[in-house]
């Protein structure tokens, strides 16, 4: 077992890590017009992940931009409700609700989408955000939990979760050259949250354990 001191070092220095080889960067010149979000469709989770606000932002954008939103995630007790909400707004041509997808499919979506949307009300670490960034995707999210520590200045932090705010930032950045943000996003995850960084942290813990014995 780790000593108390070593355990403290491990918790402090070794956050979640990403396989940055598997989650490699997809260049923006190869990306299309898709938006992507991952959200398990449980009733509380769709509120936490602001899924209805994301859907409403698509309604605001559909006549301005040629874009399509893909929603992935385990089917929960709000799945049918979300499908109905999309249908009643006449957005079936603009939004696909995919349900559960494989990791291979997730990687394809992350490497081909224009923006990854996760404007949450609260988060822990924000693992999906880190995975998206590692794939070089420009993330639109909020300053909650540890998200700002993950994103830094290599993504788009919005001030609130209103549909108008989400829609405005997508429209503002849509025609920008996003390659520099993409490069910065992957680089940040590779530097701070890669498996190589985790291995280094573990070695530091081992050294700490050695020093305490």
Residue positions per predicted region:
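Single conserved hydrophobic/aromatic residue that forms the stacking wall/gate
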Residues: 1-6, 10-13, 211-213
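Conserved donor-binding/catalytic core segment of Leloir-type glycosyltransferases
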Residues: 27-49, 55-58, 70
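Short hydrophobic beta-strand element within catalytic cores of glycosyltransferases
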Residues: 138-141
């Amino acid at each position: 077992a780790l000593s108390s001191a070593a355990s403290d070092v491990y918790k402090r220095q070794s956050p979640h890590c990403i396989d940055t080889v598997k989650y490699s960067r997809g260049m923006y010149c190869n990306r299309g017009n898709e938006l992507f979000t991952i959200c398990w469709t449980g009733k509380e989770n769709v509120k936490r992940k602001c899924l209805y606000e994301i859907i409403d932002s698509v309604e605001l954008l559909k006549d301005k931009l040629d874009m399509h939103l893909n929603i992935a995630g385990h089917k929960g007790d709000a799945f049918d409700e979300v499908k109905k909400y999309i249908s009643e707004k006449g957005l079936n041509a603009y939004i696909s609700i995919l349900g559960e997808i494989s990791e291979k499919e997730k990687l394809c979506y992350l490497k081909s989408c224009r923006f990854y949307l996760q404007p949450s009300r609260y988060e822990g670490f924000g693992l999906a955000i880190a995975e998206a960034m590692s794939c070089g995707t420009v993330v639109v999210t909020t300053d909650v939990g540890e998200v700002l520590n993950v994103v830094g200045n290599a993504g788009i932090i919005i001030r609130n979760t209103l549909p108008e705010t989400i829609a405005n930032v997508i429209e503002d950045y849509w025609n920008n050259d996003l390659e520099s943000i993409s490069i910065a996003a992957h680089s940040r995850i590779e530097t701070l949250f890669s498996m190589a960084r985790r291995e280094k942290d573990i070695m530091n813990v081992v050294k700490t354990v050695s020093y305490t014995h």
